[in-house]
A protein has these predicted regions:
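Long, low-complexity intrinsically disordered regions
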Residues: 164-179
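Short, charged beta-turn/beta-strand-edge "cap" motif at the junction between a beta-strand
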Residues: 6-8, 101, 125-130
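Short, solvent-exposed cationic patches
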Residues: 4-6, 97-98, 153-156
Length: 179
């Protein structure tokens, strides 16, 4: 499996190509998209296109990330690790495997939540706001014509014309070959 150092190098390399940190994380740890019945075709095209660049990392993990502009976390598509968050009225965001890790006065809690499989929790530090999963991903998948690229550049194996040649019959019997 991919270790922390390899994952960090992979993230860094993709950031150097001009992608945003949320986009890199979507590529590295995609949602379960192939058989998702209600996912938009543009989001499926994004995941299909990027699946040609690298294999998905399926965890199990809750992966925190930051680059100074964003701080966030995402849960792998299997969702086997718990990730819970609390947002306080005085501006703190706390994420951990369980609630109650940090003592917070009940009247200071603005909201509690749980990260779901394949979903991203993101704080835009420049705007000082939490960005919803749909908002993040919809803006990223509309950035380029992924559907067009998939249609014009990906050829399924079932569409490749080929002929199967029968292999010649072996002329030697088993005992002769063993000698």
């Amino acid at each position: 499996g991919i270790g922390r150092r390899q994952r960090q190098m992979c993230i860094r390399d993709r950031l150097m190509t001009g992608r945003s940190l949320p986009e890199v994380m979507m590529i590295l740890v995609p949602e379960a998209w192939e058989k998702h019945k209600t996912m938009s075709s543009s989001k499926k095209a994004f995941y299909q296109f990027n699946s040609c660049l690298m294999e998905p990392w399926d965890g199990p993990a809750s992966i925190p990330f930051t680059d100074g502009d964003y701080i966030g976390a995402l849960l792998d598509r299997n969702g086997l690790r718990p990730s819970r968050y609390s947002v306080t009225h005085d501006g703190y965001v706390i994420m951990s495997s369980e609630t109650g890790v940090v003592d917070i006065e009940p009247e200071n809690i603005k909201m509690h939540g749980r990260l779901e499989p394949g979903k991203m929790f993101l704080v835009n530090m420049n705007e000082g706001r939490i960005v919803e999963d749909d908002e993040i991903k919809n803006s990223i998948v509309k950035k380029y014509p992924y559907s067009k690229w998939v249609k014009s550049n990906i050829l399924p194996l079932s569409k490749i014309p080929y002929r199967v040649k029968k292999s010649p019959k072996e002329k030697l019997n088993f005992e002769t070959r063993l000698k």
